[in-house]
């Protein structure tokens, strides 16, 4: 992002964990008017030093605050991130009438309304009370995308089909997988089949990620085989194809990932290869959501006992010893509790604020119901053309379905893209022969 801004003549910098020693210098440049754009991840708002010592000075001089991927603010959304809720605290402390712009390409009407409501409430808490939130929604039509689905009987058939398909498809692209292990397996098979690819997952270190992204942009590899770790911020205008080996759990997240293709070319191929194991994977990820109340109370009680005894903060590692939760799930839970005001991250770990906290069972049930509805919508997308769709006028067109699910305000009744497999705009190869499948087993 910083490099792209520089090429456009915009002076952009970022503050992150990799350049802490430069924070003072960057702040001085901001105060001197030598920076046009400061890029900060929402996760940075939970860093005690940044939150308490750096942010107040930066917010005071901001002429515009932009929230990208704003759908992450809403727990109605497919990609809720608790750290985004801290943006509300930032907005409440802005000088009067500071403009705020929130952008997203993947929010339906419900998520858009929730984001607007939360932003408005945050502004009203600060000195900018009385300001209204204006919501602008445009079309989601992407005429360069040729969408298709190929249902194959097993994993070996999908691997064999994929190797043959990429081998005959021009250009470079992304192959998305649902898990790290699947990404590694697919990448290994493609390399064995003579296709130049590399794996890109959440376990790939930052320097290697940057190198792999540059390799794809320069077409030094045919594809990156990636999990959702390859997402926000990546831009390759001439990306020629996106293939999903396994379906995402939501049409909204699917639309976001396939939207990386065809930004600067007239035609890009987008193929979904669903698997029978997809639902089990969705259920596993869903089970990693907010824990039951008894597990939350164990952590809160431990922090409160430490506070009452006059002790210091408890690290995440120490808190792991009082709960059966995995580290990643524990950290996610603590972030939600932080946003809710029950705990606070400080130097050395976490501490209780002493404020009462109620387990919002209705909220978590609502989020779970929304998650299951999104899963059913994804299954409906897979079955388009074979059975009626509950979405008005979208049974015979994949892009019309995605636009309908996302509440595209400009979708006209009966509209069809003319580019997907159901519209006759994309021909997909048949199932691979037994020899190819056998080689993939």
Regions found by a protein language model. Give the residues of each.
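Helicase motor core with emphasis on the C-terminal RecA-like subdomain
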Residues: 1-303, 311-318, 343-354, 358
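C-terminal accessory region of SF2 helicases/translocases
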Residues: 221, 239, 247-256, 262-441
């Amino acid at each position: 992002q910083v490099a792209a801004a520089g090429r456009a003549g915009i002076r952009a910098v970022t503050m992150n964990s990799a350049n802490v020693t430069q924070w003072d210098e960057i702040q001085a440049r901001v105060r001197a008017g030598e920076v046009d754009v400061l890029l900060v991840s929402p996760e940075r708002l939970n860093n005690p030093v940044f939150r308490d010592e750096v942010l107040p000075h930066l917010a005071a001089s901001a002429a515009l605050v932009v929230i990208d991927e704003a759908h992450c603010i809403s727990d109605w959304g497919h990609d809720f991130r608790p750290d985004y809720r801290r943006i509300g605290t930032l907005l409440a402390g802005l000088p009067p009438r500071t403009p705020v712009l929130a952008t997203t390409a993947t929010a339906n009407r419900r998520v858009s309304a929730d984001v607007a409501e939360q932003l408005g409430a945050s502004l009203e808490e600060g000195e900018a009370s009385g300001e209204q939130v204006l919501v602008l929604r445009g079309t989601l039509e992407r005429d360069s995308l040729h969408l298709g689905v190929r249902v194959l009987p097993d994993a070996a058939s999908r691997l064999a089909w994929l190797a043959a398909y990429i081998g005959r498809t021009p250009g470079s692209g992304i192959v998305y997988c649902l898990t790290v292990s699947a990404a590694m397996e697919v990448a290994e098979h493609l390399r064995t089949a003579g296709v130049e690819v590399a794996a890109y997952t959440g376990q790939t270190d930052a320097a290697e990620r940057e190198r792999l992204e540059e390799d794809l942009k320069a077409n030094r590899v045919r594809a990156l085989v990636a999990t959702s770790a390859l997402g926000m911020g990546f831009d390759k205008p001439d990306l020629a194809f996106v293939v999903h080996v396994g379906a995402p759990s939501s049409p909204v997240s699917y639309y976001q990932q396939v939207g990386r293709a065809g930004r600067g070319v007239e035609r890009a191929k987008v193929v979904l290869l669903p698997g029978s194991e997809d639902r089990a994977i969705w259920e596993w990820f869903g089970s990693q959501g907010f824990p039951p109340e008894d597990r939350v109370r164990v952590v809160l009680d431990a922090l409160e006992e430490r506070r009452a005894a006059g002790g210091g903060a408890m690290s995440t590692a120490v808190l792991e010893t009082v709960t059966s939760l995995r580290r990643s799930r524990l950290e996610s839970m603590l972030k939600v509790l932080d946003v809710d005001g029950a705990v606070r991250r400080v130097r050395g770990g976490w501490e209780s604020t002493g404020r009462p906290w109620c387990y919002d069972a209705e909220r978590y049930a609502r989020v779970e119901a929304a998650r299951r509805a999104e899963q059913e919508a994804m299954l409906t997308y897979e079955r388009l053309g074979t059975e009626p769709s509950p979405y008005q006028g979208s049974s015979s067109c994949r892009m019309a379905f995605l636009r309908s699910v996302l509440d595209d305000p400009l979708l006209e009744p009966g509209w069809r893209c003319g580019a997907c497999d159901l519209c006759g705009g994309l021909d997909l190869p048949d199932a691979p022969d037994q020899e190819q499948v056998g080689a993939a087993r």
